[in-house]
């Protein structure tokens, strides 16, 4: 809402509707009505999602192309702490992770996101090696496994410890352990039962890894050419593409014409 330094408070229906929709997604089966009865702005919405955060992921991916059917869902509890996760891969090149603690959005992430990312990378790496989907020379990083990922993480705990006044980041270290354990166990079970999905995820991560490596080499090549392309360097002295010093030689010549075409 906004008052703009006046005595009249103006509510933005779209902002309220978006927040209420999040609440409906995060609390499966909860029905929320939003109604605007202001003259000329009449509208209402009725929201109830039996699938909870699974439907949240489907809604977020409504304009994207998933690379596998269905949303991967997992949940677990330790003591008074509860965590549930839902995610799906698409053919996009960006990642979208939305995390919540006690229904409060944590845009800067925190321990729940850290636990998820660590477990996702280690579990997929182990699965890829075990199923011979990864070779010895393949180096896949966490960012490669998260390319095209849409994920919702929701945790509920009695003593949430937020960092900063805006509650943008969750600091409970025990939540990292809980989420990591859930993902490690449940994702491994899912991959064993759904090998086609596992292969699709690994194939996408491998493609992302190779693209990242190609981009890195291209940047290094441009930097080398830029460093050696100054006015002080003669045109005949070209950059060397070989990075192994055992396979290269250095020729030192004197004068502008002494080297010829060397």
Language-model features: locations:
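GHKL-family ATPase ATP-binding module
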Residues: 1-262
């Amino acid at each position: 809402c906004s008052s703009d330094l006046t005595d009249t408070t103006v509510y933005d229906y779209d902002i309220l509707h978006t927040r209420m929709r999040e609440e409906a997604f995060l609390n499966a089966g909860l029905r929320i009505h939003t109604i605007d009865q202001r003259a000329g702005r009449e509208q209402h919405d009725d929201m109830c999602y039996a699938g909870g955060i699974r439907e949240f992921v489907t809604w977020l991916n409504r304009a994207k192309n998933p690379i596998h059917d269905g949303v991967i869902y997992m949940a677990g509890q330790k003591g008074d702490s509860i965590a549930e996760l839902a995610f799906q891969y698409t053919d996009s090149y960006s990642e979208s992770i939305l995390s919540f603690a006690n229904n409060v959005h944590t845009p800067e992430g925190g321990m729940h996101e850290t636990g998820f990312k660590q477990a996702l990378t280690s579990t997929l790496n182990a699965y890829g090696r075990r199923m011979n989907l990864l070779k010895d020379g393949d180096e896949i990083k966490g960012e490669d496994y998260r390319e095209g990922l849409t994920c919702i993480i929701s945790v509920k705990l009695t003593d949430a410890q937020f960092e900063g006044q805006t509650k943008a980041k969750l600091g409970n270290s025990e939540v990292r352990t809980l989420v990591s354990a859930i993902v490690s166990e449940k994702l491994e079970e899912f991959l064993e039962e759904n090998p086609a999905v596992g292969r699709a995820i690994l194939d996408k991560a491998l493609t992302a890894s190779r693209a990242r490596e190609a981009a890195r080499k291209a940047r290094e090549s441009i930097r080398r050419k830029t460093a050696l392309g100054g006015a002080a360097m003669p045109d005949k002295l070209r950059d060397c593409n070989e990075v192994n010093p055992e396979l290269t030689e250095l020729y030192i010549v004197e004068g502008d014409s002494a080297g010829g075409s060397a």
